[in-house]
Amino acid sequence: MQTPSENTDVKLDTLDEPSAHLIEENVALPEDTFNSYWSYILNEIARCKPLMIMFLIPVCLVLLITFFHDIKGILVFLVISLILSIIILLIGITAFVSETLNKGFIIKLLVEVITRKPAVGGKEWRIIAYNMNQYLFDHGIWHTPYYFFCEHRCHKFFKSLIKQTRSNAHLSSPTNGAENTQSNTPAKEVSNEMVKPYIFSSDPVLEAYLIKAAEIHKEAEFEYWRKQYPEVDLP
């Protein structure tokens, strides 16, 4: 039997989380708002002053090259400057985007996947992408509520996150160091933490969310391919 406080918590949770069909009806992703992907990219650049400056420099250099292409000395200087400015722009974009990959953002994405259990290509990914866009904007992590252009990019990001964290964990697994010390160390002195292999992350909290989300996604992919090829009877 639930206590009054538990009933209140359930009601509050229900109020805080609208029903799925209402969320789906109000979901508008950047692909629905912008005419094209390039107009979306230009909008994102225009909303961020550092990126805007780094973007305008190559544009100005291209214009200067068209005006001074007959003067060899100036042309060489401008071309070198253009190449360097493009490299700086790419580094700036990479650094700017990588700032969003903090623990809070990753756990929020994993919680969305665990809660909604999205099917492969399912509408749940639209809701997840929308919620993540709002989360990043509301917390000041991203300058617009348009981080994920569409649900497919959100899904692709999630899969790359699982793959990347898994490979990083294998490279930094404590068992690598433990194997080198076990020959000179009694078995009783080797702690359980020392020989425990990490599947995704050495952070136990992040590890738990990653494992659960990966299991849900694996089940969704298995179900998707089972429906695609029903004649193959898999266990």
Swiss-Prot record:
- The UniProt entry lists the main location of this chain as nucleus
Region of interest called Disordered, as start-end residue ranges on this chain: 169-189
Q: Name one GO cellular component term.
A: nuclear envelope
Where would I find the Glycyl lysine isopeptide (Lys-Gly) (interchain with G-Cter in ubiquitin) crosslink on this chain?
A: K11, K218
Q: What ranges does the record list as Polar residues composition bias?
A: 169-186
Q: Give TM segment ranges.
A: 51-71, 73-93
- Tell me the InterPro entries matching this sequence: DUP/COS
Pfam annotation, one family: DUP
Q: What is the annotated localization of this protein?
A: Nucleus membrane; Cell membrane
Question: Could you share any additional remarks the record makes about this protein?
Answer: Present with 1695 molecules/cell in log phase SD medium.
In the record, the note on similarity to other proteins reads: Belongs to the DUP/COS family.
Q: How does it assemble?
A: Interacts with ULP1.
Q: What does this protein do?
A: Does not confer resistance to killer toxin K28, a protein-toxin encoded by the M28 virus that uses S.cerevisiae as a host.
**Protein name as annotated:** ULP1-interacting protein 3
Q: Say which species the protein is native to.
A: Saccharomyces cerevisiae (strain ATCC 204508 / S288c)
